[in-house]
């Protein structure tokens, strides 16, 4: 068992950056958090605010080094973001060690990918799925099963009808849908509020939450 643990700590992680801030998006907004940004994404979203994290090339660090770096921070909530976390086969090792060290774990994902070894941890973490606002967008069934919320970026192309896809109905019914105005732009805030009002008439309550960290000029 100890030998396996040592081997896992030698696992190389494609890491973009680690930093402490507040969670500025979604249902856990305001929570003091340490962000682990993994390097590499399978999508190319036009409004992506982290283009430097898209490529799969870049520095790699041992998991043991990452764990040591986390000890410099005071927050005990970890947000694994990217890039796309589920594009990394090493993700289960990261989550396992974080949970064993007493951290709470949140993963921000575009929802298109899944790593089977994550199933044993999925119930005990907070998965935030951010589907893109187009009708034919695919979300992996396991992500839909374990996600705690759906977060949609409301941009010029976003349509309310996307929210009514059959696979999203549970989240609408349970009030676990967040509309995030693109880049906190005024016209997108107005659009999100309009959609929220229309959905209220259909007995669905969604939340409109801007990128709060940007309001405080935080990372």
From Swiss-Prot:
Belongs to the radical SAM superfamily. 7-carboxy-7-deazaguanine synthase family. Substrate binds at residues 22-24, 37, 81. Residues 28-219 form the Radical SAM core domain. It comes from Aquifex aeolicus (strain VF5). [4Fe-4S] cluster binds at residues 41, 45, 48. This is 7-carboxy-7-deazaguanine synthase. The keyword Transport does not apply. PROSITE patterns: RADICAL_SAM. One of its GO terms (biological process) is queuosine biosynthetic process. It catalyses: 6-carboxy-5,6,7,8-tetrahydropterin + H(+) = 7-carboxy-7-deazaguanine + NH4(+). Binds 1 [4Fe-4S] cluster. The cluster is coordinated with 3 cysteines and an exchangeable S-adenosyl-L-methionine. Binds 1 S-adenosyl-L-methionine per subunit. Homodimer.
